[in-house]
């Protein structure tokens, strides 16, 4: 579609743009104490954005703005997931004490800008658009990570984030330039057509360029060895932003990786087809398998050694990126299906774990295991809910985490004997993760003195806890609605429109 025709299908992004402008202008009229009210403008904008997505014809599969963006149910799925994560984080941000004393108008406006950037990430089908989308998300993240300007840890987190982000962006941009030189185009399908004619040194150059591009993608999902920013940034950032970074950009990153490999290395067809990839001359499935093993193993082994729960959850998120990467070398629609289901389940349990950390800290506690000592007796509701999140993150039934891992392992095993070793390594890593997740439960209920006084969280906190804990349990028992939603979303636009 040309630019004017594309606007008719671009309403969600247009609403987001207006939301950002209105939020920034509205903040000018609020005092410092009232700036938190700007959250209402962003929430309203996100609700309208969601309605715009829902009202669009889900059967339309096309491209927008001169073939720069894809419009399909696959993108709509991830946009909805990103909106859900953002809405939950806005409610979580209202309950954190870390933002006290700061104007939060820019905070909520930056969240909306990040959402816009992630919308571009999940729809991009041109390398230049991929780069711009990642930069929009990254720059917003840099500012939000350092939002606590009077906190040295937050300043350090932002600085490290900028340095690592610039490094990975530079490597990715170098890879993009090589691909453009070889293919003569930045469009995914044009690159695919040119790739079939590569020979000798050109084939090697394309392999090298793909690895460089993967560095940029790996940076967004915290895959090893592009994960170095994650622990320090997660620990130093406002915990609400840490929770957000662990979920939304990770989902957008996986959406981008899947689309890139399907439309560059595959035939760009619907994911309902049994075969995801048709071009396997380059060893990228083996590369992703090794990346998955290294990512989940390092994440789990280092998480075991942490005494700070926030930092432990950072390494945990690295391990979960490894679990999701396991499904991609299967070259099948079942693998993509598994990743999408896992991301839905992961959203609730991971945001829930971080929200418990936020609430405990707001009650005068801290982020270390010692601060959680006896928490199950002092705050029984919080302790029970945290236990649910830890069990789910481990992947124990009947929780959402188990269903997510079940689909991942099923996809790997069903792909054939060549990936059985990957399933075995994944199983061993799941057992390893049991140690540090259950350590949290042990500290809460079996260490420290039992408290005579019991603290019951206020109603808004209880509401958020239940909004995260109930789906974590329900989706472990009845996940058919999620499975159906994912199935309907597994459609990519084809080369012939």
Language model: regions and residue ranges:
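Alpha-helical transmembrane segments of multi-pass membrane proteins predominantly involved
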Residues: 1-497
């Amino acid at each position: 579609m040309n630019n004017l025709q594309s606007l008719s299908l671009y309403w969600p992004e247009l609403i987001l743009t207006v939301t950002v402008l209105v939020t920034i202008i509205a903040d000018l009229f609020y005092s410092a104490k009232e700036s938190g009210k700007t959250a209402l403008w962003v929430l309203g904008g996100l609700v309208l954005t969601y309605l715009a997505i829902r009202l669009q014809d889900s059967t339309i599969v096309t491209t927008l703005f001169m073939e720069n963006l894809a419009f399909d149910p696959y993108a709509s799925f991830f946009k909805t997931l990103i909106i859900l994560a953002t809405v939950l984080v806005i409610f979580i941000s209202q309950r954190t004490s870390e933002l006290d004393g700061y104007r939060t108008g820019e905070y909520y406006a930056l969240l909306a800008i990040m959402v816009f950037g992630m919308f571009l990430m999940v729809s991009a089908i041109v390398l230049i658009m991929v780069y711009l989308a990642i930069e929009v998300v990254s720059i917003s993240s840099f500012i939000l990570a350092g939002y606590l300007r009077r906190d040295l840890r937050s300043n350090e987190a932002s600085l490290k984030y900028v340095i690592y982000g610039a490094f990975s962006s530079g490597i990715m941009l170098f890879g993009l330039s090589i691909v453009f030189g070889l293919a003569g185009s930045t469009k995914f399908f044009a690159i695919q057509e040119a790739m079939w004619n590569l020979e000798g040194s050109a084939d090697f150059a394309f392999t090298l360029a793909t690895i460089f591009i993967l560095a940029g993608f790996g940076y967004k999902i915290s895959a090893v060895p592009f994960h170095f920013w994650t622990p320090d940034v997660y620990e130093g950032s406002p915990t609400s932003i840490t929770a957000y970074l662990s979920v939304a950009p990770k989902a957008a990153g996986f959406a981008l990786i899947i689309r890139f490999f399907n439309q560059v290395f595959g035939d760009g067809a619907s994911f309902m087809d049994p075969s995801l990839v048709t071009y396997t001359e380059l060893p990228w499935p083996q590369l992703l398998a090794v990346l998955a093993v290294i990512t989940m193993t390092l994440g789990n082994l280092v998480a075991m050694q942490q005494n700070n729960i926030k930092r432990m959850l950072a390494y945990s998120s690295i391990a979960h990126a490894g679990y999701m990467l396991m499904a991609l070398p299967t070259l099948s629609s079942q693998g993509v299906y598994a990743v999408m289901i896992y991301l839905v389940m992961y959203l609730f349990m991971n945001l829930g774990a971080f929200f418990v950390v936020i609430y405990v800290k707001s009650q005068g506690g801290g982020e270390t295991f010692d601060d959680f000592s006896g928490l199950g007796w002092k705050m029984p509701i919080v302790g029970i809910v945290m236990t649910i999140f830890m069990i789910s993150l481990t992947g124990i039934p009947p929780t959402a985490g188990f269903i997510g891992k079940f689909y991942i392992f099923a996809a790997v095993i069903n792909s054939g004997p060549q990936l059985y070793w990957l399933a075995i390594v994944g199983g061993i890593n799941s057992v390893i993760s049991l140690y540090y997740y259950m350590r949290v439960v042990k500290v809460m209920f079996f260490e420290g003195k039992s408290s005579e006084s019991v603290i019951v969280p206020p109603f808004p906190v209880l509401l958020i806890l239940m909004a995260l804990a109930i789906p974590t349990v329900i989706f472990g028992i009845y996940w058919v609605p999620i499975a159906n939603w994912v199935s309907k979303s597994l459609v990519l636009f084809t080369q012939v429109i």
